[in-house]
Amino acid sequence: MAKQIQAIRGMNDILPTQSPLWQKVEAVLRSSVSAFGYSEIRTPIVESTDLFKRSIGEVTDIVEKEMYTFEDRNSDSLTLRPEGTASTVRAGNEHGLLYNQEQRLWYMGPMFRHERPQKGRYRQFHQFGVEVYGIGSADIDAEVLMLSARLWDLLGIKEHVALELNTLGDPAERAAYRDALIAFLEQHKDKLDEDSQRRMYSNPLRVLDSKDPQVQAILGDAPALMDYLGEDSKTHFSTLCELLDAVGIQYTINPRLVRGLDYYNRTVFEWVTTSLGSQGTVLAGGRYDGLVGQLGGKDTPAVGFAMGLERIVLLLETLELTSDIAPEVDVYVTAMGENCVVEAIKVAQELRQQLPTLKVMSHCGGGNFKKQMKRADKSGAQFALIIGENEIANNQVAIKPLRTNNEQQLVTRSELVAKIAELI
């Protein structure tokens, strides 16, 4: 027997028993962005490597360690997309969507990072994101946070997530703070862990995000970014906080929140949970006003967020919030004998045509009554329709409940559609 080929480590199959929960999450995401008037954009999963080097930053962990990069037959360097924002900006610039225009966009699809697989973190993962271009005021920051809060309401996890906010100021303010932070870190260099020492000059703000307890203790005396902000940045942030207060969205200001990508400025935020252990972030984003210009377009204000679907699914499973998933099949149509197959197929087709949202599965492959009812039960259907020679002779169909103890009932063929519509 030939050796069985396995899935690549960290790239998982979503099996038929799992897909209904995924479909529920995806439906909530789609309905939420639709309610806010956002439009979908779909981009390729493979992009030029330079796109991510220029957007994410060459000294970030993603570019240095985690990207799936290869040369094609033309010796061009290509990369499987590790996130969605850069591709969205590239598409917007390329197709003239962003020049002097406002755009509210969303995307959903697979992303790729060569990380160590662990709970809630995989090498292929699915990301949902929202991007707004052309609006620089704090009210649009509030809108994307309101949209994200709506997701938790609809998914039933509002009480299990919390919003953290910070502001990074504009590039000039951040540069002044960067110099002050480097000067502070140099005084404590011998006490920093290896990662923080490496980042101290290349990306010092990421040291604020260190998970090392000793580094965090040192940072207790570090200069505060808020002290380096100008009036415009302070006003933008305070306005955002006032708007969130006005609509009842609770938040915590976290001065250590910096985000892992180089392109953020001013507002940054994360929705976190304590229900997934170390992988606590379920949605993150912020403002990136310089990215469109950085990738060859006209300078354009922008704000957005991204969330990993695997973590949302894991959170719902952890909290045992999966019981309301709709069944894959509503009605299972059986044919009790070869002479009944044609009639059974006609019944199934009539139900699908008359009740377009009804999920109808027909039994195929023959078999006795016991076998067919076993298949019907395994399908998850609420009802089995039994079509035998007696039923055909009397122009009837038997409706057998599979999930309750209610009695089986006979209805005429002319009554069937209305009766099923009433029962489902």
Swiss-Prot record:
Keywords: Aminoacyl-tRNA synthetase, ATP-binding, Cytoplasm, Ligase, Nucleotide-binding, Protein biosynthesis
Record GO cellular component, one term: cytoplasm
GO molecular function, one term: histidine-tRNA ligase activity
Single GO BP term: histidyl-tRNA aminoacylation
InterPro entries linked: aa-tRNA-synth_II, aa-tRNA-synth_II/BPL/LPL, Anticodon-bd, Anticodon-bd_dom_sf, His-tRNA-ligase, HisRS-like_core, HisRS/HisZ, HisRS_anticodon
Top-level enzyme category: ligase
Catalytically driven reaction(s): tRNA(His) + L-histidine + ATP = L-histidyl-tRNA(His) + AMP + diphosphate + H(+)
Pfam family, one: HGTP_anticodon
PANTHER family: HISTIDINE--TRNA LIGASE, MITOCHONDRIAL-RELATED, HISTIDYL-TRNA SYNTHETASE
Family that this chain belongs to: Belongs to the class-II aminoacyl-tRNA synthetase family.
Subunit comment: Homodimer.
Protein name per its UniProtKB record: Histidine--tRNA ligase
Gene expressing this chain: hisS
